[in-house]
Amino acid sequence: MFSVLISLYNKEKPENLEQCLESLHQQTLNADEIVLVYDGPVSESLKAVATRWANLLPLVIVPLEKNLGLGKALNAGLERCTHNVVARMDTDDICLPERFEKQISYMESHPEVVLSGAAVIEFDEHGKERLKRLPLSNNDIHQFARMKNPFNHMCVVFRKDKVISAGSYQHHLYMEDYNLWLRIMSLGHPVANLPDVLMKVRAGSDMVNKRRGWNYIKSEVQLYRLKLALKQTGFIRGTLYFLIRTMTRLMPVKVMQFLYEKDRKG
């Protein structure tokens, strides 16, 4: 048995939420519980979508009085999840039909694994698609995590008790997930990624532009300090990675777009 954890923000488009929930309904293995957190007040049109699907899905609505941000909203929802195995999803993404069947089966057959993810296909408003794969083995994920986020957050499955023991989600602007993965791995818990493509993820043409600027650099500083504190990397290598990641946040949009495209093709 497993729960699905989703956070809904007022700026989400009703049609995106509709596709998200429809993809959950079309799974070959149905979720036992879908915890949908309203991160602050949401529009009547969004509520209408949720209400309509509540007749077909095991939805548990968790309304928050005000917008708390992704990390705190997910923590509120995590508390309401009644099953220890929890699958994450975002309201603007689409699960492929066999997602839960494959991921839950993997977690059941690998009880030692605390956190697992999968490959995703990113698509934009023009229908252009990019494949995003990540390292599969525990060792390769640890190596990759020194430089980049080793999981597609919207497509992970984890064990609730281990996430809570690692400190749950903590405030880290744009990087709540990366922060949590590092803390989980620092405790020695095995992690993995499946090679299967199990989700389609919206990645608009303005996504690269949103990943620039001083707020992102502040988050990079916080991430750098966390990696050193957890001994995820040494000082020299960690500083080099920090400088590389920070420089990309200051590059012109077209340069960032080129590097992003090259990274996906690689």
Swiss-Prot record:
InterPro entries: Glyco_trans_2-like (IPR001173), Glycosyltransf_2 (IPR050834), Nucleotide-diphossugar_trans (IPR029044). Its EC number is 2.4.-.-. It comes from the Bacteria. One of its GO terms (biological process) is polysaccharide biosynthetic process. GO terms for molecular function: glycosyltransferase activity. Keywords: Exopolysaccharide synthesis, Glycosyltransferase, Transferase, Virulence. The keyword Glycosyltransferase applies. The keyword Transferase applies. It is an enzyme of class 2 (transferase). Pathway: Glycan metabolism; exopolysaccharide biosynthesis. Belongs to the glycosyltransferase 2 family. Involved in the biosynthesis of amylovoran which functions as a virulence factor. This is Amylovoran biosynthesis glycosyltransferase AmsE. The gene is amsE.
